[in-house]
Amino acid sequence: MTKFLQSGRRRDICALLAGEQLQAQALKSRLESHDGERIEPKSFYGALDVLEDSGFVETRTDGIHDVYALTEAGERRLHEHYDWLSDQLQD
């Protein structure tokens, strides 16, 4: 696994984007709901930037909103992590 998915927050972002595209604020709200705490915008957008720079997430503009989606590479990495995690839990 590359270092870009070693962060729990980045993995969670990829998991939330699996199968759907989300506006940044909706994505941030879902993460905050899952974590049970507020996420600093700088931290959230920093994680998105790393994922986009590494080719795991792509952005498109829809009106005035940025919409994020998982790329094929991001989906592959997420499935690799899921497979690894499943193997660990079966042991």
Regions found by a protein language model. Name each.
Residues R9-C14, F44:
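Short alpha-helical "packing" element that flanks the helix-turn-helix/winged-helix DNA-binding module
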Residues Y45-V50:
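Short, hydrophobic-biased segments on the C-terminal half of alpha helices
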Residues S7, T61-V67:
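Short, Lys/Arg-rich nucleic-acid/phosphate-binding segment
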Residues Q25-G36:
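DNA-recognition alpha helix
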Residues G8, L17-A26:
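Short capping segments at the starts of secondary-structure elements
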Residues E52-R60:
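A short, conserved structural fragment
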Residues H81-D91:
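Amphipathic alpha-helical dimerization/coiled-coil segments
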